[in-house]
A protein has these predicted regions:
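Eukaryote-specific long, low-complexity intrinsically disordered regions
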Residues: 1-7
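Extended amphipathic alpha-helical regions
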Residues: 14-32, 39-40, 44, 52-60, ...
């Protein structure tokens, strides 16, 4: 089922709504969890998801999610990290934002129709001869690439590339990570100036996220850690939630650096960097890490929460083209350009937002 068909069942029929949703092509990256040299290192693939709900070319909300696939020989572990979620407050809406985010986030978590190319092995061939002869010879071999732009060669038959994709093992474990911290703006600059945007406290934000996660992770192991506070105060409001975190998988406590994933713009990562500078990283256990984390600047003041959920269910990862037809795929470069353009927009000016959306939609047609 496509994301459009899911969301449009929820939205009111008295307005013109659109979904803007795309993924980046899967790309090989370093693992978000440090893996020691003595153990097998899986291939790690990252996919960036971005969703935005539009109403008459005005952005209402945005959600950015990063998915990491750790590919072992016989299974895959999936890490889902909610990077940012924000609203603009530019439109008065007749529905609740969480009613849209619940199915959208679940769609991103459950999506498995990834087509991943084989990893390119590092070349061990010696460096090319830098002499002019060999450089000219290499350039000549690339000239046919430009033939299609020349009128004389327009009759050449099109080139068809046969792209091979990896046969992936089944998915074994899915983990969801959400770091909640109150802020005026996450994605949309100056949106806090709009009267229609609701700014809430850290505890209210944490409860809001827990309600969303509670509905889309039924049957999962669900944990909450609130550094510096008693997490049970929040957990007792929900069924089948536990106080704590999902970073420790065995009875014997592991080191923090080998157990805790580090994501972009992650306060845990900044603390890890400090431990490296202080030469304490190798001896830092998870329990000690979490205790000291509560005294970090990002965790002082308002309520901050770390939500972690685990699902141990074996599923097949699809590698055919059918599952990706309804999803727009873009390059990482295109994704970064889109995000950077959003950062330059004044979201207190609806005309500027409409102009951006209109131009973007016309550029991708």
């Amino acid at each position: 089922m496509s994301l459009d068909s899911i969301v449009f069942k929820i939205l009111p029929q008295d307005g013109f709504y659109e979904n803007l949703y795309f993924q980046t092509n899967p790309a090989y990256v370093n693992s978000p969890i440090h893996i020691s040299k003595s153990t097998f290192k899986p291939d790690t693939v990252k996919i960036r998801h971005f969703y935005s709900l539009l109403h008459e070319n005005v952005i209402i909300l945005g959600l950015e999610v990063f998915v990491y696939l750790q590919i072992y020989e016989d299974h895959i572990n999936k890490l889902v990290y909610v990077s940012k979620c924000d609203t603009t407050g530019l439109k008065k809406i007749s529905f609740k934002i969480n009613e849209i985010l619940e199915p959208v986030l679940k769609f991103m978590i459950d999506y498995n129709d990834y087509r991943i190319r084989p990893k390119k092995e590092k070349s061990i061939t010696p460096r090319e001869n830098p002499s002019p002869y060999f450089r000219l010879k290499k350039l000549c071999s690339q000239l046919p690439e430009a033939y299609s732009s020349l009128k004389y060669y327009n009759d050449l038959p099109p080139r068809h590339l046969d792209i091979e994709y990896r046969n992936l093992p089944p998915l074994r474990t899915t983990k969801l990570y959400i770091f909640t911290r109150p802020a005026k703006e996450y994605l949309f600059p100056n949106s806090s100036l709009n009267s229609g945007k609701h700014l809430i406290s850290g505890s209210a934000l944490l409860n809001w996220w827990m309600k969303i996660v509670d509905k889309i992770t039924i049957g999962w192991e669900r944990r909450l850690l609130v550094p510096g506070l008693d997490s049970r105060t929040f957990v007792r409001k929900f069924e089948n939630w536990q106080d704590g975190h999902i970073f420790e998988e065995t009875e014997e406590e592991k080191s923090a650096v080998n157990s805790i994933p580090i994501f972009p713009d992650d306060p845990k990562g900044r603390f890890m960097e400090q431990l490296v500078v202080e030469n304490r990283i190798s001896k830092m256990l998870i329990s000690r890490f979490m205790m000291e984390l509560a005294y970090r600047q990002e965790f002082l003041g308002d309520t901050v929460g770390i939500i972690g959920c685990t699902c141990n269910e074996s599923l097949d990862i699809q590698t055919d083209a059918e599952g990706t037809k309804a999803v727009k795929l873009i390059t990482i470069r295109e994704y970064k350009e889109f995000i950077n353009e959003i950062k330059l927009i004044d979201f207190s000016n609806s005309d500027e937002v409409i102009n951006f959306v209109t131009q973007y939609k016309s550029s991708v047609i």
